[in-house]
Amino acid sequence: MKLFIFTCLLAVALAKHKSEQQSSSEESVSISQEKFKDKNMDTISSEETICASLCKEATKNTPKMAFFSRSSSEEFADIHRENKKDQLYQKWMVPQYNPDFYQRPVVMSPWNQIYTRPYPIVLPTLGKEQISTIEDILKKTTAVESSSSSSTEKSTDVFIKKTKMDEVQKLIQSLLNIIHEYSQKAFWSQTLEDVDQYLKFVMPWNHYNTNADQVDASQERQA
């Protein structure tokens, strides 16, 4: 009898324990489901707020995006136009600015030719004395010609011809002497230097425009 009562009590205790476990497990499941639902609602609300903010920013930035797209298209058109210009310049070789002419002298070898620098030949001007002598010579020639034409006798013609030839030779010799004096005064270069002239393209931001000054022969000799 006691054994039967003990078994009944044990069975009732086990049944209560099982029911408590089931109820606790059901409560934990329901709590976890509620937490999951709360998390889902939070994520959905956060996603909705993010979408709303993005939509607002997109609506605000639509004119800016349109402006940027328009400016980018204009820049692309400008770049395309500049490329066409560059192609034309490369095709026709049109200089962008006035190039500088640079004369490069060719250096001669010293063992086969004397190196002399070419100078501009400046002939000296005639003075008053030289002009007066030339005028006197011309007057004498005209006087001799007039005297020879006026004479009629043969003997006088022969004598006049001889004197005329002598005077003409003297005039020629005097003119040659004057030319010789001026040729010694003038500077004549024995050999002319060969100058190769070519076109050199230089950039305007790294080149200073320098013009070659003309050298005066008289100043060079005085120095």
UniProtKB/Swiss-Prot annotation:
The keyword Repeat applies. InterPro entries: Alpha-s2_casein, Casein, Casein_CS. Coiled coil: none annotated. One of its GO terms (molecular function) is protein homodimerization activity. The modification Phosphoserine is found at residues 23-25, 28, 46, 71-73, 132, 147, 155. Sequence repeats lie at residues 76-128, 129-223. One of its GO terms (cellular component) is extracellular space. Residues 1-15 form the signal peptide. It is found in: Secreted. The keyword Glycoprotein does not apply. Mammary gland specific. Secreted in milk. It comes from the Eukaryota. Keywords: Milk protein, Phosphoprotein, Repeat, Secreted, Signal. PANTHER family: ALPHA-S2-CASEIN-LIKE B (PTHR16656:SF5). Belongs to the alpha-casein family. Important role in the capacity of milk to transport calcium phosphate. This is Alpha-S2-casein.
